[in-house]
Amino acid sequence: ERTVISNLRPFTLYRIDIHSCNHEAEKLGCSASNFVFARTMPAEGADDIPGPVTWEPRPENSIFLKWPEPENPNGLILMYEIKYGSQVEDQRECVSRQEYRKYGGAKLNRLNPGNYTARIQATSLSGNGSWTEPVFFYVQAKTTYENFIHLIIALPVAVLLIVGGLVIMLYVFHRKRNNSRLGNGVMLFELMRMCWQYNPKMRPSFLEIISSIKDEMEPGFREVSFYYSEENKPPEPEELDLEPENMESVPLDPSASSSSLPLPDRHSGHKAENGPGPGVLVLRASFDERQPYAHMNGGRKNER
């Protein structure tokens, strides 16, 4: 036995169930089914796009292509392939069926101004369909007004970027310069501390320190004089330490006072040990007769 089933979709998989029945089928029913899977043959031209391809201009150097789907394709349409170009159709773009059903076509972006041609081909489970007739479209160049608008927008942005870059460079430069100055100061402090601690004879004077760091000073700071200060003033001559009750016996002439003083006798040592007696004038040593002492810079504090 054989039969022909018509009006099936091309290149489609079907399951066919067969039951045997007789005149008692209404009472007893038919036999158990026996099934078979079979795929129909592909139809020629079923995957071809039936209608013409149209296009619509879009901004930003792009266009939108539209085309109808095959009415009865071989199985299932998988994707569409677009082949386009300006002089030679050397560029290709694939569009899935889901994307086509969402937008109703495809958008071509980043096109240069000029004339183009495009053709479209559908791909199904059976294979590729035929290419459509070429569609011609063109992309217009941007007008001068649009270029001017873009220039107005881009110019302030570029200026801001340049100014921001300069500010960042100056900040980094000054920060690096300040860090280097701080490092030099720390190194100089450590060197001076070691000299002061381990070798007092090699302690530099204040002027030597200034001379060693004068290259690191600001131009205005170099003009400040360090040769005179309150600390470098010569000491004031010390006054005589006299008791108020003995002020009348002190002569005004230093030579007269030295000649009028009595010479020490043999008991002077005894008196010196027990302290000066009443009526004896005690004069302190002058500044020149004092014992000099060492200054931190290597000189003498009371030298003139």
UniProtKB/Swiss-Prot annotation:
Activated by autophosphorylation at tyrosines in the kinase activation loop; phosphorylation at all three tyrosine residues is required for optimal kinase activity. Inhibited by MSC1609119A-1, BMS-754807, PQIP, benzimidazole pyridinone, isoquinolinedione, bis-azaindole, 3-cyanoquinoline, 2,4-bis-arylamino-1,3-pyrimidine, pyrrolopyrimidine, pyrrole-5-carboxaldehyde, picropodophyllin (PPP), tyrphostin derivatives. While most inhibitors bind to the ATP binding pocket, MSC1609119A-1 functions as allosteric inhibitor and binds close to the DFG motif and the activation loop. Residues 264-273 have a biased composition (Basic and acidic residues). The chain crosses the membrane at residues 148-168. Residues 231-304 are annotated as: Disordered. Residues 169-304 are cytoplasmic. One of its GO terms (cellular component) is plasma membrane. SMART domains: FN3. It is found in: Cell membrane. CDD domains: FN3. The modification Phosphoserine is found at S225, S229. Its main location: membrane. Pfam families: fn3. Belongs to the protein kinase superfamily. Tyr protein kinase family. Insulin receptor subfamily. This is Insulin-like growth factor 1 receptor.
